Amino acid sequence: MNLKHIPLLLLPFSLQLNAQEIKAELNKEFKRQEKMSYILDYPKNTKGNVPLIVFLHGSGERGNNLELVKAHSPFTYKNLIKEPVAILAPQCPADSWWDTVTVYNLIKEIQKKYKIDASRIYLTGLSMGGWGTLKLAMEHPEMFAAVASVCAPTDQVMTANIQQFKDLNMKIFHGGMDDIVLPENAFKFYQKLHPVNPTAELVIFPNDNHNSWDSTYSNPQLYEWMLSKKKEK
């Protein structure tokens, strides 16, 4: 036996004797700076609290030009909305995806500053904003009276947490010819959603490509449906 090899053979045992297993919990409040530009269309000369529609734009409207967030949105079709409502459209920074923590905190801040009916907050968004819509609805289902996603990418986190959507009034819109975000995103998500939320609706526009937002937001029935819903306290 070569004795000079003994220390190497004993090394793993030595390391095990010097290791310790630590079980603990991190419980600390971390402060972070939150910054997000937005447009708020708030009705004039209204008495009492008003409903709030939150709109999350797609990737093409990111950046620092706030006028872009009005494109392809409920802003375009305000004349179809038959009662006074506030419309909130934040802007996602360039080269980013939606930070739903910041969006949530922005909504809470708007509630503090303006007369918003907490039982009538509605969430919608298209493409990247549709993803943000589903993500925020998953994280805070207690906030929204109705949710409408349009041509939204979906992910495994959403389907793994599908129970979060079970009590929401929801519509999923998608173009049947969409070659940017394939319709399979909507189909697969709805297959998971329907068993836990049978009232949720999947709406496919068979001839629409990625621009299914036009068919969605130009339909006055969308706003009638949204505004008919109230969040139970």
PLM features: what roles do these ranges have?
Residues 1-21:
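Bacterial Sec-dependent N-terminal signal peptides
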Residues 17-52, 85, 131, 136, ...:
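A domain-start/cap signature at the N-terminus of enzymes
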Residues 44-48, 95-128:
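Gly/Ser-rich "nucleophile elbow"/oxyanion-hole loop immediately N-terminal to the catalytic nucleophile
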Residues 52, 56-102:
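Active-site machinery of serine-nucleophile hydrolases
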Residues 66-79, 106, 152-163, 184, ...:
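Alpha-helical scaffolding within the catalytic cores
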Residues 113, 119-164:
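Primarily recognizes the serine-hydrolase "nucleophile elbow" in alpha/beta-hydrolase
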Residues 170-173, 179-233:
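C-terminal catalytic histidine-bearing segment of alpha/beta-hydrolase fold enzymes
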